[in-house]
Amino acid sequence: MCKGRRNTFSKSTSACEIVYRILENWSTGNENFVKEFEKTVDRVLENCYDGHGQRNDCGVRRLKMEKNMKSKIVVDSSANVYELPDVGFACVPLKILTDEQEYVDTAEVDAPALAEMMRTYKGRTSTSCPNISDWMAAYEGADEVYVVTITGTLSGAYNAALLAGEEYEQSHEDARVFVLDSLSTGAESRLLVERLAALIKAGKPFDTVCEEIRAYHEHTHLLFALESLANLARNGRVKPAVAAVARMLGIRVIGQASDAGDLEVLCKTRGEHGALERMVLEMKAHGLTNGRVHIDHCCNAAAAERLKHMVHAVFPEAKVEVGSCGALCSYYAEYGGLMVGYEDSEAPTV
């Protein structure tokens, strides 16, 4: 028996301490203890639900912290996010394959050098997604797992992550796994990952996080401007003839991720300035006002910064950040490419 322990509960009493005192006092017929325990049960109900029987997220947050549930965000490397501070996080790499070498898309890969090499490479190239065991290993150690994958139309990553989630839940009692097909890649996926982190830090319960990230996803978008379509053609994403004509005429292709997750060509332009102008017009047409914008570039920092200034000229309150593509996005965006993820004006806040 632990001496000096008072048989009362306070708002700071931990769940473990409550259980210990139940075992210690319940069989003794301690009436004061029973009364305090009943008060604690009332506190739990009061914390979890309001007067109308609806879930009280703030109360759930307090009890969740007592239980010490471990949350983790898991993303494949197409999001160009390799680390995330202040929240459980894992990045599962995709791979770029050539006849001579395999490149694992981690933060250590020299993505600009890879993009430069691909400009003149004549051999076969392809990409491969993480398998089920890769995803399972990334989920390990978490009770609540939130996953964001590259669009299922480009990769099998989503299906593998989904199957891994089912296995993880079966082998880990009380674990829950939510898998979101971004229907996109790159900068838009990064927006989703960062919103997940904000929801977790806010102490939202699992079901609420899932519901709110789905709602947020309805208001995020991806644009891209590509100088070359060679690797997309090699992997069957566009017709080789289209890629050849674009290369010969020096055409830049402006496109977007469609609602179905396909890469959809919007227009073709000549010259960088025209391409950037069209991207700003597309963002305006889709409702960008003062939201967040992520610009990722492949060996084209000058164009990315120029686009940032053009966005601010039209939307002074927009929150614009510039980053670089990782290996997988560099492979598809190719040398000089830009990928832009942005929120529209109806994007919900945390």
Show where each model-derived region lies.
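Basic polycationic patches enriched in arginine
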Residues: 5-6, 21, 43, 55, ...
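Mixed-charge interfacial surface used for oligomerization/domain docking
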Residues: 66-71, 78-90, 94-95, 100-101, ...
